[in-house]
Amino acid sequence: MDIANIACVWEQRKLGEVANMHARIGWQNLRTSEFLDSGEYMLITGTDFQDGKIDYSKVHYVEKERYEQDKKIQISNGSILITKDGTIGKVAYVENLPMKSTLNAGVFNLTVVDDINTSSLYLYHYLKGPFLLRFVNEESTGGTIKHLNQNVLVKFPIPLPIYREQLKVSSFLTNIDKLITLHQRN
């Protein structure tokens, strides 16, 4: 079997079938005056994404009540974040989270529904590929400022190999990312 046909034999699922996704809803929006320079609860925004990760040195913080306001946007290691406003479709994988964290508006928090059958790292790698951006550009709404709607994102098709294969694919792609980062430093 050649490489071009591999994904054809994998199960095809919709993103909404394999992941839960949540974002800060309108009435919960934070005012800039609520952004703190230090604290116990980090606030992650799309501008904190750097090369598929969160740059924790640039984040703001919020009060405990704003963190506790919505458990569905409290992020954890293994969460996948996708920007939905402005520069849409940027993807970050959460790891090495140093403290409790929540999201600002403009970012989806994705968590896999079944972590026995779906690898969050595999899903992250697939989402950061060109397929999501292509899909987003075809499906996004708005004029000069685009917006990615959740009802569109849930329809995004995901080729899903068996879990063991997902681990192999994500390990391979993670190693490539590490090599790219290493070469960019030199």
Residue ranges and their predicted role:
Residues 84, 100-108, 141-164:
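A short glycine-rich beta-alpha junction/loop motif
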Residues 45-46, 57-130:
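A short beta-sheet element
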Residues 3-26, 155:
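Non-catalytic DNA-recognition/assembly elements of restriction-modification systems
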Residues 1-14, 160-186:
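Amphipathic alpha-helical coiled-coil/heptad-repeat segments
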Residues 28-34, 138-140:
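Short coil/turn segments at secondary-structure boundaries
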Residues 16-19, 31-66, 110:
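DNA target-recognition patches
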Residues 13-18, 47, 105, 130, ...:
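Structural detector for helix-capping/boundary residues
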Residues 4-9, 109-119, 133-134, 151-167:
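Proline-centric
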